[in-house]
Amino acid sequence: MGKSASKQFHNEVLKAHNEYRQKHGVPPLKLCKNLNREAQQYSEALASTRILKHSPESSRGQCGENLAWASYDQTGKEVADRWYSEIKNYNFQQPGFTSGTGHFTAMVWKNTKKMGVGKASASDGSSFVVARYFPAGNVVNEGFFEENVLPPKK
């Protein structure tokens, strides 16, 4: 397997998440060693099969998950920027989950406290990134999106 996520990559992803979270007036996330380890293990599993698919919910406890694939070795900021760019499709007037905005809403979910991230390279040079969030965002209960996905501050 290729190289695993470096401390620099972890910090890049975390910094980008927290800069975006700040725009939405929600508390910063902290990196969690256990979540980093689990995300790393799963990114390596994805890289070995070269198939991008979410892990079974039962295997990640109460964690949410974002995934990213690129044909090259992607930077942490690039991954976070790509997930966050889904904000353009999010309707703050009609909050809720849609498949086209789930990466963005997971990133800025107010109640999420911790994250972990992993990256692995496949034999063809492509890279797989896994982010895990605790507690998970994108909870579809009544009122949860209104409370947790706040519009960016002016």
From Swiss-Prot:
Pfam families: CAP
Keywords of the record: Coiled coil, Golgi apparatus, Lipoprotein, Membrane, Myristate
Residues with a covalently attached lipid (N-myristoyl glycine): 2
Keyword field contains Coiled coil: yes
Tissue specificity comment: Highest expression in lung and peripheral leukocytes, and minor expression in liver and kidney.
Chain intervals for the UniProt region annotation (Disordered): 1-21
Domain of life: Eukaryota
GO terms of molecular function: protein homodimerization activity
Regions of compositional bias (Basic and acidic residues) in chain numbering: 9-21
Limits of the SCP domain: 14-132
GO biological process: positive regulation of epithelial cell migration; positive regulation of epithelial to mesenchymal transition; positive regulation of ERK1 and ERK2 cascade; sexual reproduction
Positions of region (Interaction with CAV1): 91-98
Localisation per UniProt entry: Golgi apparatus membrane
GO CC field: extracellular exosome; extracellular space; Golgi membrane
Membrane disposition: Lipid-anchor
Positions in coiled-coil regions: 30-53
UniProt cross-references to InterPro entries, sorted A to Z: Allrgn_V5/Tpx1_CS, CAP_dom, CAP_sf, CRISP-related, SCP_GAPR1-like
Main location: Golgi
Annotated PANTHER family: CYSTEINE-RICH SECRETORY PROTEIN-RELATED (PTHR10334)
Entry similarity comment: Belongs to the CRISP family.
Record note on quaternary structure: Homodimer. Interacts with CAV1.
Name assigned to this protein: Golgi-associated plant pathogenesis-related protein 1
Organism for this UniProt entry: Homo sapiens (Human)
